[in-house]
């Protein structure tokens, strides 16, 4: 299962590393949008859940992963810029579906509000329009650690909060990833955190009024940071949305344990292919994974 790899020029502004898992047997293509400072490796298990039923597209943001060496790192990217970049990739790969994780939901909502012609449906996982108490505490501490480029503290903060339900192996890999980031990546993450804290939640919700395609929101029952109850507020504004809560699971969903992987896959397939039935087998993914929010 080897993807086609490429570095794409996006309107002369950015160069973006992509991986395209393609098979002639798949009729539809889905593009995956990762969380803040996560990389294509973060979606290793999700790719296994979706491919070869779908063609799957992964990409690294210009400031991270394998896109990083191909770009000049000046001002942080805004969620609007990330949304526009996603629209360009949707057009390039002729994608019919989008699946986002965590902060990737912000860029995905921006893109969907532009009503891209090809998109038929979207899945937004581990995302909420509400900054509740636990999330605010996490963001406030994160701002301090990121501003000081305190790698040790930031790595432990993520593992002790949104990542607390991850297996110990993934926590170790997560810590190594977060603690080895470049300074501009910490600055980008600091900007993300600031944006989340300063943004009026109605901004997300109002944008939802312009989204016409079906959207599924998936949250973990144990995720107190982007909770299922908070995500349900999207129902006030989106014309066609549904919700699925993965039991006994936190923020990282299919990465956390076998049952979460099985239930996450089933939720995806029931939504993307309502008639689809499958028996899922959890595959512990070996190698390097980057899981940062």
Each model region followed by its residue ranges:
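Conserved HGGG/HGGXW glycine-rich cap/lid loop of the alpha/beta-hydrolase fold
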Residues: 14-69
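Active-site loop/oxyanion-hole signature of alpha/beta-hydrolase fold enzymes
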Residues: 58-99, 263
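Gly/Ala-rich beta-loop-alpha elbow adjacent to hydrolase catalytic centers
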Residues: 100-104, 108
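Conserved alpha/beta-hydrolase catalytic His-Asp/Glu region
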Residues: 133-135, 153-208
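Flexible "cap/lid" loop of the alpha/beta hydrolase fold
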Residues: 113, 121-150
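Catalytic histidine-centered segment of alpha/beta-hydrolase-like enzymes
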Residues: 249-262
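Short beta-strand/loop motif that positions the catalytic acidic residue
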Residues: 211, 217-219
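Acidic catalytic loop of the alpha/beta-hydrolase fold
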Residues: 222-226
